[in-house]
Regions:
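N-terminal intrinsically disordered, low-complexity, charge/repeat-rich segments that act as generic
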Residues: 1-70
Length: 71
């Protein structure tokens, strides 16, 4: 049970980290190229997604760490 949960969380972490390091930077760059960032909905949406993914990765890593500490 514990190992399956860790494996599931680590799979999610891997997917989110891929999005964070490969997909989101491209999205943010494309949105930047559209011009004025103050009124650029695509840019703000990509940055919001980036913050969400960073928070989710952090939470999942914390959970994995907590599971490892359980007996």
């Amino acid at each position: 049970m514990k190992d399956a949960l860790i494996k599931r969380f680590e799979k999610q972490i891997g997917g989110l980290e891929h999005e964070l390091t490969h997909e989101l930077p491209k999205e943010i760059q494309r949105a930047r190229e559209l011009g004025d960032l103050r009124e650029n909905a695509e840019y703000h949406a990509a940055k919001e997604r980036q913050r969400f993914v960073e928070a989710r990765v952090s939470m999942l890593k914390k959970r994995v760490s907590e599971i490892h500490l359980m007996n």
